[in-house]
Every structure is written in structure tokens, then in C-alpha cells.
Curated annotation (Swiss-Prot):
The modification Cysteine methyl ester is found at residue 198. The gene is Rala. One of its GO terms (biological process) is positive regulation of epidermal growth factor receptor signaling pathway. InterPro entries: P-loop_NTPase, Small_GTP-bd, Small_GTPase, Small_GTPase_Ras-type. Its EC number is 3.6.5.2. A lipid is attached at residue 198 (S-geranylgeranyl cysteine). This is Ras-related protein Ral-a. It catalyses: GTP + H2O = GDP + phosphate + H(+). It comes from the Eukaryota. It comes from Drosophila melanogaster. It is found in: Cell membrane; Cleavage furrow; Midbody, Midbody ring. Coiled coil: none annotated. CDD domains: RalA_RalB.
Length: 201
């Protein structure tokens, strides 16, 4: 008797978005390989996959580090469609990159058409607090307006690097559980309706 193939670990798809030079790649590489790579700006999107243990369960995280082609709307929209959760990164030392998060958020909501998509606002380079250009209160206010978590990270010192990826994976997992319950509830309703129709006949 052949055994049913066992399902592999759950896969969570994360998309990194943000202006150039804010440290999206540095955060990704620090999380993937425990290495700080300064001034790494890829010219094309890079995809990374890693097995991790999330709250005692082995899962896979798939990270798409967007770059360069974000200027091409069709390519950018395809990336956004494939994502289950988003880390929207800016540098606390660069106000322009903070202002740009508004546009990234709007683009994602337009493509996903879903206000409650798993999403974290990430202020990177918190090791350079003496060069801070974006007040903490302003960052927290924006996150509050969007109803999303706000976390400050440093790809250099590794501060909160694991936290943002794991927190986002938890949000994605929670969302999948809710969606699965909703789908199963709708299927049960359809079955009930079919049974009622049979009874009426």
C-alpha cells in the first residue's frame, strides 16, 4: 500500500520594498547568511529561500528582494501579486525614503486590493541614530494610520533583523489560517444548500 506523500514545510512569501540605498538587501543578506554587506545594490531582483523554525514548526521563507525593475510598473505589479507579506523599508537617516513608503503602500494596496495584507513598516539603520532625519514619533504615527506594526532595525548590528522576518511570517501564517477557515466555512454552506435542495425535491 503506497503512502501518501507528506506535505513539505509551509512556504511564506515575503517581498522587500523600499527606495534604493535603504538597506533592503543588507537586511535580507544578514537574515539569510548572518553577514553584513554594505553598499550592495543589486541591479535585478534576487530571490532567497531558507528553512527556519517558527514557533516550533519548520517552515520555509521565500524572500524577494526587489531592485531596479521597480521602475517598470508591470514587473513591479507581478512581484507584488506573488507576495503574501511585505516589509516596507526606509532609512531613518533619509526623509525622502520615508516619504516614498506612502507610494509603495498605495501600489501594494492597489495590486492586492486588500487593506489587511500582512505588512510591516521598517525603519532601518537605527545604529545611526545620531544622523536620524525621521523622528520616531512620525514613523509611529504613519504605522498607526496604516494599522501596521513599526519596527526599527540595523542590518549592521543585526538589531531586530530576525524579529521583522519572523513577525511578518506570523502575520502571514495567521492570515492563511483565517482564509482557510473562511473557505472551509463557505464550502460547508454550499454543501448544506445542496442538501436542502435535495430535500425539497
Amino acid at each position: 500500500m503506497s503512502k501518501k506523500p507528506t506535505a513539505g514545510p509551509a512556504l511564506h512569501k515575503v517581498i522587500m520594498v523600499g527606495s534604493g540605498g535603504v538597506g533592503k538587501s543588507a537586511l535580507t543578506l544578514q537574515f539569510m547568511y548572518d553577514e553584513f554587506v554594505e553598499d550592495y545594490e543589486p541591479t535585478k531582483a534576487d530571490s532567497y529561500r531558507k528553512k527556519v523554525v517558527l514557533d516550533g514548526e519548520e517552515v520555509q521563507i521565500d524572500i524577494l528582494d526587489t531592485a531596479g525593475q521597480e521602475d517598470y510598473a508591470a514587473i513591479r505589479d507581478n512581484y507584488f501579486r506573488s507576495g503574501e507579506g511585505f516589509l516596507c523599508v526606509f532609512s531613518i537617516t533619509d526623509d525622502e525614503s520615508f516619504q516614498a513608503t506612502q507610494e509603495f503602500r498605495e501600489q501594494i494596496l492597489r495590486v492586492k486590493n486588500d487593506e489587511s495584507i500582512p505588512f510591516l513598516l521598517v525603519g532601518n539603520k537605527c545604529d545611526l541614530n545620531d544622523k536620524r532625519k525621521v523622528p520616531l514619533s512620525e514613523c509611529q504615527l504613519r504605522a498607526q494610520q496604516w494599522a501596521v506594526p513599526y519596527v526599527e532595525t540595523s542590518a549592521k548590528t543585526r538589531e531586530n533583523v530576525d524579529k521583522v522576518f519572523f513577525d511578518l511570517m506570523r502575520e502571514i501564517r495567521s492570515r492563511k489560517t483565517e482564509d482557510s477557515k473562511a473557505t472551509s466555512g463557505r464550502a460547508k454552506d454550499r454543501c448544506k444548500k445542496r442538501r436542502l435542495k435535495c430535500t425539497l425535491l
